[in-house]
Amino acid sequence: MLQQIYDFLNINYNVSRETFNKFKEYYSLLSKWNSTINLVSATTLQNFWQRHIFDSIQLLNYIHNKDIIVADLGSGAGFPGVVLSISGIKNVILIESDSRKAAFLLQVAQLSDQKIEIINDRIQNLKVKCDIVTVRALANLSTILSHTKQFTVKDKYLILKGKNYQHEITQALLHNKFNYRLYKSCTDDSSWILEIKI
């Protein structure tokens, strides 16, 4: 089973054996911490590779240069931000308002060889400069755009969304101007990757 997972990651995302071992360590840390602060649901923890690693790493398909700054909003358990960092993104900013989750992020960030900054604060309190914003399971699109209006985003937003994506886009367009593209998620038929450029 693990060999098949490694082969998939290696073929599709050039994941080395060393990086794969870091993902295994990630799972161990997450399992340990999850019993006390509920970072992810027990069901998705059982499906760690597809639900969390594959779901996060697929964003690399839409990131064409690893020497960038990615700001990950509401990082929680570190998906997708920490996964992208372990996979080689040079600079990742993890923004998490819950201090217990920020403490977990501080520990799991040590698995990465790249630069990770953890900010324990609310998104709307910050002025962040980055190339790409990533978001997974945080808030509706209108809220995300409202909370980041003071950010300087050079390239785009990459947002993992579920089946209500079209309603969220329609609502957000009432108060915001942006161009968007939709890409099918490789992990769930009802999930999408929403790419937004403002």
Swiss-Prot record:
List residues binding S-adenosyl-L-methionine: 74, 79, 123-124, 136
Query: Per its UniProt entry, what is the enzyme's top EC class, as one word?
Result: transferase
The keyword Coiled coil is assigned to this record: no
Q: Which InterPro entries match?
A: rRNA_ssu_MeTfrase_G, SAM-dependent_MTases_sf
Q: Which UniProt keywords apply?
A: Cytoplasm, Methyltransferase, rRNA processing, S-adenosyl-L-methionine, Transferase
Spell out the subcellular localization from the entry: Cytoplasm
Quick one: signal sequence residues? Answer: none
Q: What is its EC number?
A: 2.1.1.170
Cross-referenced SUPFAM superfamilies = S-adenosyl-L-methionine-dependent methyltransferases
- GO terms for CC? cytosol
One Pfam family name is: GidB
Q: Which Gene3D superfamilies match?
A: Vaccinia Virus protein VP39
Question: Catalyses which reaction?
Answer: guanosine(527) in 16S rRNA + S-adenosyl-L-methionine = N(7)-methylguanosine(527) in 16S rRNA + S-adenosyl-L-homocysteine
Question: What molecular functions are annotated in GO for this chain?
Answer: rRNA (guanine-N7-)-methyltransferase activity
- Please state which protein family the record places this protein in: Belongs to the methyltransferase superfamily. RNA methyltransferase RsmG family.
Q: Which NCBIfam families match?
A: rsmG_gidB
Please describe what this protein does. Answer: Specifically methylates the N7 position of guanine in position 527 of 16S rRNA.
Q: Return the PANTHER family for the record.
A: S-ADENOSYL-L-METHIONINE-DEPENDENT METHYLTRANSFERASES SUPERFAMILY PROTEIN (PTHR31760:SF0)
- Can you name this protein? Ribosomal RNA small subunit methyltransferase G
List the source organism: Orientia tsutsugamushi (strain Ikeda)
Gene coding for it? rsmG
